[in-house]
Amino acid sequence: MEKLAALKKLPSILRPLLTSKSSYHRVPSDRPTIMDAATSEQLHGLTNRLLTEVNALVSSYSSIDCQHPFLAAACESQNDGSEARSNILSSLSEIEAIVRGPKEFLENIAIQCEMLGSIQWLGEFQILACIPLSQEVPIQDVANLSNVPEQQLAQMIGLTARCGFLIEPRRGYVAHTPLSASFVTNPSHLDAAMFLAEQAAPAALKSATATQRFTESHTNNETAFSLATTTKVPFEAAQEQSPRLSRQWAAYLHHAGGLPEDHVLADAMAKLHWSNISKAGGQVVEVGAFLAAKPLARLFPQLRFLVQLPAGASSCESILCDPSDPIKPGQISIANRVPGSPQSVTNAAVYVLHLPSSVPSQILTELQVHLPALRMSNGVMLIMSGRVLPGQDEPIRARHAAVAHARGLIMYQMSNEVEMDLSSLLQMLDTVRDSTGKLVLVHKLRSCSGMTVAVVVKYQLMAGGAS
């Protein structure tokens, strides 16, 4: 309720900016100057958009009586406001980029640097778990329980509380905010933060040294990560040796890597005409992951699914054994397939391909081995492009693009892998051909944010070709 009250105040804070006749902009000299007309118009447009987005979020929270116990779950599930929140943050980022100067830019870097260090410190000493989820507690008690200096803990809280992570309800006391509490109730949030603090940030700060020392190297054990960790073990091998690192990396990709969430993928895929395939009792082959088969099987009982996973991938059998699930017995089958091996199923209506990595050569191999199957089946293939960087012409907001490019940099600093962008993927598709035909782009599936989450391709005969 406090969050809702704060949101309702935001429009009154923003309106003076819309009605102001003299807007100021900070320039590199740090001296205020009158904005040019184009920049002023852009700022007013962004502010109007932000007001609309705030009102949309307030409406989503207000549409259900969340205080009524019977409706609390519905409020949480139907009005989580994730899309509206994302839009608001994107607009705020664009406004900030216009109005901030070097001073504000550096101040923000300083805050984020110490915030990351503070959260890592709080996590290392398990302090967040020592604070009750729903009541305040003396900072001294938390310090004693965690065996850390009270003064240092108070300093950490002094910063994080100003950023909405923990709160000081009164002097000498601390309590959780919804944000900090989520790092206790959902430990993967803390795993993601610990990865950023312990692996990503140190590797990023070794990037210059890595460039100087490994100028021409493309091997996966001569990286910024290897310098930061003083090891010659490649990042992928390090994950195999350390379950903690593997868990933290997965948490980072899920929460902060800019990858589309499962429900976003499901919404985008639902736009396709699966019912046409379902009526014909068609088969769908999902390659490399088990994400699309289950939600689609619930919607279309006549569809049959084969999920092909690499040997050693975590078993999905238990997922198929839930007696309460409406999925029909035998509707989904699971088989092993080595990435890059020929596609043995040549009569599927749809192939859903999850790219094996961001390495162009591996992506090209997967596309080439599916070409004969697409030619023989006359089917289509969905290439899930969540791990592909957005192209320059993508209608995606700057904040979402920045998150994706941050992931690309982290991937490079960890393993020397360069993530492909969407334009490069489409150019690669044009090279996948045989003597009679080639792959052609049919459609792009976009999320609500404008990100392309999948491209739909098919096999097309070339002029003079014969099947």
Swiss-Prot record:
Inducing stimuli: Expression correlates with the formation of the sclerotia and thus the pigment production.
Localisation: Nucleus
Principal place of residence: nucleus
Record-level Gene Ontology MF annotations: DNA binding
SUPFAM superfamilies linked to this entry: Winged helix' DNA-binding domain
Keywords assigned by UniProt, alphabetized: DNA-binding, Nucleus
HTH iclR-type domain ranges (all copies): 109-179
Keyword flag Transport: no
Keyword Nucleus annotated: yes
Record function comment: Transcriptional coactivator; part of the gene cluster responsible for the typical purple-black color of the ergot sclerotia. The ergochrome gene cluster produces several ergot pigments including the yellow ergochrome secalonic acid and its derivatives, as well as the red anthraquinones endocrocin and clavorubin. With CPUR_05433, coregulates the production of geodin.
Official protein name in the record: Ergochrome gene cluster transcriptional coactivator CPUR_05432
